[in-house]
Curated annotation (Swiss-Prot):
Belongs to the class-II aminoacyl-tRNA synthetase family. ProS type 1 subfamily. It comes from Lactobacillus gasseri (strain ATCC 33323 / DSM 20243 / BCRC 14619 / CIP 102991 / JCM 1131 / KCTC 3163 / NCIMB 11718 / NCTC 13722 / AM63). Its main location: cytoplasm. It is found in: Cytoplasm. This is Proline--tRNA ligase. HAMAP family: Pro_tRNA_synth_type1. The gene is proS. It is an enzyme of class 6 (ligase). CDD domains: ProRS-INS, ProRS_anticodon_short, ProRS_core_prok. InterPro entries: aa-tRNA-synt_IIb, aa-tRNA-synth_II, aa-tRNA-synth_II/BPL/LPL, Anticodon-bd, Anticodon-bd_dom_sf, Pro-tRNA-ligase_IIa, Pro-tRNA-synth_IIa_bac-type, Pro-tRNA-Synthase_IIa_type1. Coiled coil: none annotated.
Length: 565
């Protein structure tokens, strides 16, 4: 490809609103251009990278015998209403009406459609296991699109779906997909950690995220140094090493605590450690009033709490509700005499505490020396706390390390979440009707490309992993009027193009302009044809090299083969 004919509008400086390095470099390098907030055009350079990533996906899916298909972008609302997700998905769904007033949506994902089109056509256990996938544009009405391709309103995604007659088949499919995904990320040069994750609005109870460590990441993952434990912070567990020595129960005492509406203030006022205080927070779970208790030095993890409560909507009570229900403003709520609570849920840290401080359900008052069972009851204990860095992991009891990361993939064991609701049954080997068992698998393809850039930054540009680089070799001719340089450059272009993707910079530009653009192209090998062309010598440089090396063209083929294969 001749660079003089290649549309690659580069920028000297990134726009001021581009915060992420990947966003800055993709704009500066002419990979993408914004059309509107969160929506981008993929210019030739960006589209080449995208297509190479898609080719890797296709090859790895073929290796596990998963065929590709395509579903429509425009979906009827009735399918999502049938599954119950039309309302649950919330404001992020793009909804529209046709001229007849029929409601539709732009697909953010396709579980319902695959259930309707595929699962409902699987009538016998003999037709399974089966898996399918597609690569297509998805739509999500992000409230704050940002970071370029990392959080957009339109994005390219691989989404795959598996169909099984037994749980054992689903487990095998899940493992096959996980293995294939790890190969995809490895080939794309993206370092990932498979981590325990929350399934969110997707449904199901078991899911794994693929998190790519990056400074700009919006997620936090918790890992140990051996790599035997990894979880999204939303789901991370840790061992609580605090132990309170047993004490005899003391007399329950009500004390005034004016203005002490935080744990720190209360602990200082009462001269007790935070571990001697039990926080009480009122949540509204659908139509239930749930009082949630946790030791004062810990924070509630609302994702974990949501799993325990298993409600469609879980939120903290607002100030008016708090006073109306409990009789107290913030800071004074507690479990003693909390007959208004439909349920009391406590974190495991509340067990084994003696003579603690709890709210008295009266503004500016607390109880001291409260004891579980004697003074208040708990309906359910569960791990609902947020893990802290440095706490011990539950596998090898090693300190947890937190890392910011980008979610680039997520796989789910959906089970019968959709097929039961939507009536997708098959006949088992005994002729009994059962719901099809499903899995769902996704890679954010455009997000993966941004993660690759974030992980392969150079001082002045990008060092693309070789399998997704837009070009394998970047030929740069220094002087276009130099006949020896032109002859050698055209010879190398012809020879190398039979095996590699070659970009030949034949522009009549200054060397500085060419080198700056080459840094943004980030090809694995840059070959410069300069003043020693007449001697058969070129300069070769990798993006991560500080200096170029001189190579005789007789040795060039062997060197390129060694580098690129």
């Amino acid at each position: 490809m001749r660079q003089s004919k290649f549309f690659m509008p580069t920028l000297k400086e990134a726009p001021s609103d581009a915060v992420a390095k990947s966003h800055q470099l993709m704009l500066r390098g002419g990979y993408i251009r914004q059309v509107t907030a969160g929506v981008y055009a993929y210019l030739p350079l960006g589209y080449r990278v995208l297509r190479k990533a898609e080719n890797i996906i296709e090859e790895e899916m073929n290796n596990i015998n998963v065929p590709e298909m395509i579903m429509p972008h425009l979906l009827p609302a009735t399918l999502w209403q049938e599954s119950g997700r039309y309302k649950k998905y919330g404001a992020e769904m793009f909804k529209l009406q046709d001229r007849h007033g029929r409601e539709s949506l732009l697909g953010p994902t396709h579980e319902e459609t695959f259930t309707e089109i595929v699962a409902k056509n699987l009538k016998s256990y003999k037709q399974m296991p089966l898996a399918l996938y597609q690569i297509q544009t998805k739509f999500r009405d992000e409230n704050r699109p940002r970071f370029g391709l990392l959080r957009g309103r339109e994005f390219v995604m691989l989404d795959g779906y598996s169909f099984a007659a037994t749980r054992e088949q689903l487990d095998e499919q899940f493992d096959d997909q996980k293995s294939a995904y790890l190969k995809i990320f490895n080939r794309a040069g993206v370092t990932v950690h498979p981590v325990i994750a929350d399934s969110g609005t997707m449904g199901g109870k078991n899911s794994t995220e693929f998190q790519a460590p990056a400074a700009i990441g919006e997620d936090t993952i918790a890992t140990n140094e051996k790599g035997t434990y990894a979880a999204n912070l939303e789901m991370a567990k840790s061992i609580d090493t605090f132990k309170q020595d047993p004490e005899d129960a003391k007399e329950l005492t009500k004390v005034a605590t004016p203005g002490m509406d935080t744990i720190d203030k209360l602990a200082e006022f009462l001269k007790v450690p935070a571990t001697r205080i039990v926080k009480s927070i009122l949540y509204i779970a659908d139509d239930q009033k749930v009082l949630v208790l946790i030791r004062g030095d810990k924070e509630i993890n609302e994702v974990k709490l949501g799993h325990v409560l298993d409600a469609d909507e879980v939120r903290t009570a607002n100030a008016d509700e708090l006073v109306e229900i409990t009789g107290s403003e913030k800071g004074g709520v507690g479990p003693i005499g909390a007959d208004w609570a439909d349920k009391i849920v406590a974190d495991e840290t509340v067990k084994g505490l003696y003579n603690v401080v709890v709210g008295a359900n009266e503004t500016d008052y607390q109880y001291q020396n409260a004891n579980l069972d004697r003074d208040f009851k708990v309906d359910e204990f569960a791990d609902i706390r947020t893990a802290n860095e440095g706490e011990l992991d539950p596998v090898d009891h090693l300190p947890l390390k937190f890392t910011t990361s980008i979610e680039v993939g997520h796989i789910f064991k959906l089970g019968t979440y959709y097929t039961k609701t939507m009536g997708a049954d098959f006949l088992d080997n005994n002729g009994k009707a059962k719901p099809v068992i499903m899995g769902s698998y996704g890679i954010g393809v455009t997000r993966m490309l941004s993660a690759a850039v974030e992980q392969h930054l150079t001082e002045n540009g990008i060092a693309w992993p070789k399998e997704i680089a837009p070009f394998d070799v970047h030929l740069i001719q220094m002087k276009m009027k130099d006949e020896a340089q032109t002859e050698l450059a055209e010879k190398l272009e012809k020879e190398l193009s039979t095996k590699y993707d070659v970009l030949y910079d034949d522009r009549n530009e200054r060397p500085g302009v060419k080198f700056n653009d080459a840094d943004l192209v980030g090809a694995p090998l840059r070959i410069t044809i300069g003043r020693k062309a007449k001697d058969g010598i070129v300069e070769v440089k990798r993006p991560t090299d500080e200096k170029a090396m001189e190579v005789n063209i007789s040795d060039l083929d062997a060197m390129i083969t060694k580098e690129l294969g």
